[in-house]
Amino acid sequence: MSCYFIAQICINDEAEYKKYLDKVDEVFEKFKGKYLAVDESPTVIEGEWKYGRMIIIQFPSEMEFKHWYESPEYKAILQHRLKAAKCDTILVKGLTKADF
């Protein structure tokens, strides 16, 4: 079952965040991640939205997500994102045909 990594991001240090961006795609593709949406200013329909940047990434399975997020390659660059930005992230499980 697919799963979706969703992040709200507020970048405080562009130079440090660039160090993350320069390498993240290379690591990301290795683990079968697929960008579904990246928006610098999503439209708020209801409630409050804390940060401007929104990212949705699909993985084929929760296992693939964990392999990516816990990989030494990702851990090596994650530090740059954590230093450069405030982030709220969640992992959402996708639906299967049985869910309908």
Region roles according to the model:
Residues M1-M54, F59-E70, Y74, K93-F100:
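Short S/T/G/P-rich N-terminal loop/turn motif that feeds into the first structured element of a domain
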Residues K66, E73-I90:
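C-terminal structural segments of small proteins and small subunits
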